[in-house]
Swiss-Prot record:
Keywords: Allosteric enzyme, Glycosyltransferase, GTP-binding, Magnesium, Nucleotide-binding, Transferase
Ligand binding (uracil): I192, G197, D198, A199
Binding locations of 5-phospho-alpha-D-ribose 1-diphosphate: R77, R102, D129, P130, M131, L132, A133, T134, G135, G136, S137, D198
Gene name of the encoded protein: upp
Protein name, UniProt field: Uracil phosphoribosyltransferase
Organism for this UniProt entry: Ureaplasma urealyticum serovar 10 (strain ATCC 33699 / Western)
Length: 207
């Protein structure tokens, strides 16, 4: 399943991020805020346990808590820019990291870094990456994460190319994908158009 989150605030913030004149600090701030809006939607179906609590007024009141732990896994490096937006909503979430690069001969993603919390098998996992281009990195990230048997896996991104979205859903139809915008296509250089440019460079001001 994939869902395009259609909301005026998302469209406004995404437009600011797309503009070539947007400086790194503004890009990062809007990415963080946009991620909050995206994750609010992506977590609507999380399971809850009913609990009993005491309020200032009554001793026995009904409350709720998340049934499973939450684990955030940003894909390095651009995915790091989305973490704080989620942590502000789910401060108890643990964080793992996956680093992938593309082999220039085979064009396939290769893992160069991986560090996961010990509780990942007890967690609902949310993968974070601003861009879904060819889909190769996301598919490989899911391949790696599935070996740890998490409760569920969701993927949250900002912009996606149709080619990448189709590939992810073909290989991992059980992973729900949440996007702010489905863009037109990949250009001859593999960039999403109209896209955001190189999200990592724009987040960290490295170009």
């Amino acid at each position: 399943m994939h869902k395009i989150i259609n909301h005026p605030l998302i469209k406004d913030k995404l437009t600011r991020m797309r503009k070539v004149s947007t400086v790194s600090t503004v890009f990062r701030t809007n990415l963080e805020e946009l991620t909050q809006l995206m994750v609010y939607e992506a977590t609507k179906d999380l399971e809850l346990n009913e609990i009993e609590i005491e309020t200032p007024v009554v001793k026995n009141a009904k409350g709720y808590k998340l049934k499973n732990k939450i684990c955030l896994i940003p894909i390095l490096r651009a995915g790091i820019g989305m973490v704080d937006g989620v942590k502000s909503l789910i401060p108890t979430a643990t964080i793992g990291h996956i680093g992938l690069y593309r082999n220039e001969e085979t064009l396939k993603p290769v893992e160069y870094f991986k560090k996961f919390p010990k509780n990942i098998s007890e967690s609902d996992v949310i993968i974070l990456d601003p861009m879904l281009a060819t889909g190769g990195s996301v598919v490989e990230a899911v391949n790696i994460i599935k070996k740890y048997n998490p409760k569920s896996i969701k993927f949250v991104c900002i912009v996606a190319a149709p080619e990448g979205l189709e590939y992810v859903q073909k290989i991992h139809p059980d992973v729900d994908v949440y996007i702010a915008a489905l863009d037109d296509k990949l250009n001859e250089n593999g960039y999403i158009t109209p896209g955001l440019g190189d999200a990592g460079d724009r987040i960290f001001g490295t170009k």
